[in-house]
Amino acid sequence: MKTLLTAYRVADLDRSFDFYTKVGFREIGRAEFEGGTTRLMLNLPADGEFVTLELVHDPGAGPLEIGNGFSHIAVQVDDLAATLADLAAKGLAPGQLELPAGEHGPKTSMLLDPDGYRIELVEWPPGHPDGITRADFE
């Protein structure tokens, strides 16, 4: 088994697509259904051909409520400072660069999408493997 994608509802598909395009995601496919539901499949360049994020616009499902059960998605970047500058230049408002594990740990920043979903941007320190491993918790 492996994780395929993260999917969540959005209130305005065009607004969300514009936001995620600025972050670096690209459209892989789109499916439209009766009743006005649209599913937009996205990924980042390093994801190759695989969809990693699905935005679901379902106007018939009632008001969008994130609630307190969803925390965030995390996106790995090569250079967090450059990424933050690029996002700001595109009109987005990323959070400050943080060092949650001290100067030898990852650099992180939080970003909110138009619906309030949180995205954690992570730059690993030199020599760290891509992704989170058991060693990160020891």
Where are these regions (language model features)?
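Short glycine/serine/proline-enriched coil/turn segments at secondary-structure junctions
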Residues: 34-36, 63-65, 103
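Core segments of cupin and vicinal oxygen chelate
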Residues: 2, 7-50
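Vicinal oxygen chelate
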Residues: 2-12, 30, 40-41, 45, 62-138, ...
